[in-house]
Amino acid sequence: MNPEFAMPDVQSTVDTRQMPIQRVGVRAVRHPLTVRTAEGETQATVGTWNLDVHLPADQKGTHMSRFVALLEERGGPLTADAFRTMLATMLEKLEARAGRIEVSFPYFVNKTAPVSGVRSLLDYEVTLTGDVRDGLTRVFAKVLVPVTSLCPCSKKISQYGAHNQRSHVTIDAELAADVPVEDLIRIAEEEASCELWGLLKRPDEKFVTERAYENPKFVEDLVRDVARRLDADERIVAYVLEAENFESIHNHSAYALIERDKRRGA
């Protein structure tokens, strides 16, 4: 007899405390993945995964090794549809009725400088989350987009110049259909005073300086303009949108948030 089959399976025994656990699983598992770009190509990256399931009151433990096995078996680009399939597979493997998968990873866009045309990579922080509860599967895409903001008040009251700073626009969107990460990035960048690039030449610096000056926005303007774009996108059913300006003339940030669920009209 194989000794493995003769070993007791303690986690499968009955627990007498009768206390369900809402979420139990593994966290901070680093594992490679591929994602599909807006052009239909694939990009390889490394994800930090959190996977968990609901544990019934009478079950002592979950099958921890099966979470990692799920990552080992997974293949192909991680689209919204693939994420839903992965969630269903996890619940089947873990014999669970509810569960959650979250993966965070750096995503790179090869950007072209506005004047010189020089190419360079810019990184973005992306988190995909899938949640199954009460028979309902929900998928979320979250991306942090660094941009430039320039203060309208500073421009208005100054004889020349205006204070400007780097800002973060964070979009956390619940998806009804697959949305490429770059689509969310472009929405944030197009509504900012100016976008960022990894590498710029002097003609490019002149362009971005003047672009921001001609397009001043308060943090309130920034979050509202991005929200209007998200409202018009039928692939997005709900969102939490944040903007934070790291003020260059203060030792604090300016911050704004808009949260909306289109299904409730609010």
Swiss-Prot record:
Documented EC number(s): 3.5.4.16
GO molecular function: GTP cyclohydrolase I activity
Cited InterPro entries: GTP_cyclohydrolase_FolE2, GTP_cyclohydrolase_FolE2/MptA
Marked site positions, May be catalytically important: 151
Catalytic activity field: GTP + H2O = 7,8-dihydroneopterin 3'-triphosphate + formate + H(+)
HAMAP family the UniProt entry points to: GTP_cyclohydrol_B
Protein name: GTP cyclohydrolase FolE2
Gene: folE2
